[in-house]
UniProtKB/Swiss-Prot annotation:
Region (Disordered): 17-71, 85-132, 638-715
Main location: nucleus
The organism's taxonomic lineage, starting at the top: Eukaryota, Metazoa, Ecdysozoa, Nematoda, Chromadorea
Keywords: Developmental protein, Differentiation, Gonadal differentiation, Nucleus
Location of the protein in the cell: Nucleus
InterPro entries: ARM-type_fold, Noc2
Gene Ontology molecular function: histone binding; transcription corepressor activity
Compositional bias ranges of the Basic and acidic residues kind: 638-660
Taxonomic source organism: Caenorhabditis elegans
GO terms under cellular component: Noc1p-Noc2p complex; Noc2p-Noc3p complex; nucleolus; nucleoplasm
Record's protein name: Nucleolar complex protein 2 homolog
Family to which the UniProt record says this protein belongs: Belongs to the NOC2 family.
Biased composition, class Acidic residues, residue ranges: 89-128
Amino acid sequence: MKLLKKPAGLKKRKVISKRIKIEKKPSSEDEGSSDEEVPKLDGEGSLDGSEDEDDGTVTVEKGGVKKHKLDLEKLKQSDPEFFKFLQQEDADLLNMEDDGDDDEDDDEDDEDEEEEESDDDEDDEEDDDKTKIKKIRKPKIKSDNSGRLIVDSNVYSYLQQVLVLDDETSTPTNPSDVRMAVDVFVACVARVGADIEAPKYVINEQSIFEAVVRMCFQAMPDILKRLLKAKPEGDKVLFSKTAIKKYQTYVRTYLHAMIVFLNEVQTTEVLIATIKAMTRLVDLYAHFSRMSKLLIKAVVRIWSRKTLECRLPAFVCMNLLVKNYPQHFVPLYKTAYVAFVANSKIVTNETWPLLQFMHRTFAELTILNPEQAYKYAFVYIRQTAVHLRNAMISKGRKDLIFSIYNWQMMQCMYMWVRVIAKAHSVNGAEQIGELVYPLIQVIVGIFKLCNAPTFLPLRLHCCQLLIQLQASCTNYIPILQVSCDCLEELARELKSKPKPVKGAVKLPDIECTLKCSSQFSDLPQWRKVISEHVFRTMMQSAHLLASQAAFPDVVLPINHRISAILETMKNGDHAHLFRGFQTKLKEHSRFVLDVLARKSVDINDEMQVRAVRFDLNNPDSPIKTFYRQWEKVWKMKERSAVENSKKDDKKKKKEEEAAAAKKRKPNETVEDEDDVKPEVSKAKRKRIKIGAAAKKADASVPDQFADMSMWSDED
């Protein structure tokens, strides 16, 4: 452009000089050639021998044209380079054509130069429609004593007009406004209490802080995607590489600020809103490896520690990241497993639903990429087997035994049972389904590690794990034999006389207990609870085998063993309970034998085998009828137990509140009770009398009358 501007100036000067020569032509020549006209070009007015400055036309007579041609020939001989330039740049001048006044040409050239300069200053991403849009003036931002800019209502309204757009397709995104919004959000993060460097902006009002955070959560995901020229491709979103390189500094700043904000806030509503906003930015987080690692740590922390309302959106974010970007599966899977183990040490009635939620969601993550998950599932199950082997060969070392008999180990077993059960119900996860065999061996090994009666609740948990595996994987597991071991331990405990206790005793929940202390083991209430859970285990295991043709053969040794155990059981109530179960086993054995006797079954014929299974799966069979009746009674007992625990919790809260109210000192005296003086010791009276008034107001104490304008005379 610089090379073109200099000849343009020369061109204008030459044109003016030639026109002056034409105008000085004698009048005699002008009169003789006034009848002929030069033809009209490019929409200009007719050349009638007069010069009109208003309409931009110039009239030249015949003699003037000849003189002009002679001058051009002389110019061609004297300065051929300039003549060649005129041919290339202004051929109309050589053809005696004029495009308008010189002043208008100058104005047009100036406008072209201004447009070129403005185009050079604009960013590559801005659209051509920007000149048609009204420009929003930036407000004047005040600064505090430290030099930081204060975010007030004017700044917020400006950002809202710029970021929250009605027409998202045609309106361009200004990078400077996005940078300003990122800096303002960093100020919000600093206000929350994050340990970061002093930001460029500062927010002093709580209302402005909440409004800015809400606006950023709502608008920034779409703004950043538009700035980076996001293009959806299936479930993924691709970004322009040039835009990523150009704007990655403050895109990274915003993504990191979101993670810091998530780690600092504690309110459930704010946590949920933050996770939802970050879920919309998963595509950006996945693009940056370091940001994705920080996102995984932050989201997994909420998935494993917070309330159920917060864990659900956290899992949605985890699932979306792993599903669309499989390269992040391994770090997330390992982080989630470690977080689960670390946060499963304590199990109560309140934490059981949270742990079960983690079991289900971890199984869902495993099914998303079963090939990668199999490697780590195998290693983790093998690790539990190594711990079990060390405890078995330790010859009774308590520290190694308790490394197995704890809630972390049992919760890992519950989780892997859920994972393998899920794998058996999904196509393509056969590798994980094959891990059922080592898992069964580990659970049975945990069951047989220690036969002490204090660990009877843990052994019942092992039975429940085996029941879940058999129900979901259709593999035969000798659960009835294992449950008979529990019945033998119960019979040993029942040999000793129970210790009666006066009044009501709150027993520990066996679902949240692995070890029974000696103070409860001798109580008749506890023995009753244990016998009911042993009966439940035997009922469920028998119900799983009810539709199998091998039921009589499996149950025959179990009946003999139960009879031998009941002979040693002195308590009549417990013996009566298990004798009823034994009679039902015998009745169902006869039912199965009758069904098999009525039909001739060829094992190689699949249709005959299915017909026999259909007949054995009769809902009116003895075991299934007895199971339905028992299940109704069991659910009623569970409901009553839950209601009683809620009532006890309410009573405890009321008692605690009453005790706290008694301890709390009254801050104000009531006018009606002025005559009644509380009993105060003499030493306290002396202290009250001697105490001096404060000389100066304490500035550190917040003003408790700040909302006095909201009061009324009636209050």
